Amino acid sequence: SGMLEKRHKMVAIYNAGIDSLNADLDAYHQVKYLNHMGPDHCSSHHLYLVRLSGRSREEVNHVIGQMAERGIATNVHYKPLPMMTAYKAYGFDIADFPNAYHLFENEVTLPLNTKMSMEDVEYVVENFVEIVKGL
């Protein structure tokens, strides 16, 4: 459908921008993204999650804040349950779930919706690249 084709194009723009960024980063600080397509699979491109390898939650929050200052709303998906108020009230402690925290600590989700133009996607990835290079 037209919507899925548009999402494919948007993801391709993001991937190209991040691949270019990674060429300038050391191996420890590579930005990882979910491979949405392969010979045996193709996702709906519902979310565009990236992992800022080797970065702390504070550094990721800095990126999120800088993106917001430029009018770009990012998000953090899949916050670990032990970090949510209801679970804390039952005594869950994120320190007991280091793998969950590790997956959360350097993740950010870039905007990906069909109301965006290709120019919007370019704006997002250009700013993301600039901000991450500044870390």
Tell what function each PLM region has.
Residues 1-135:
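PLP-dependent aminotransferase class I/II
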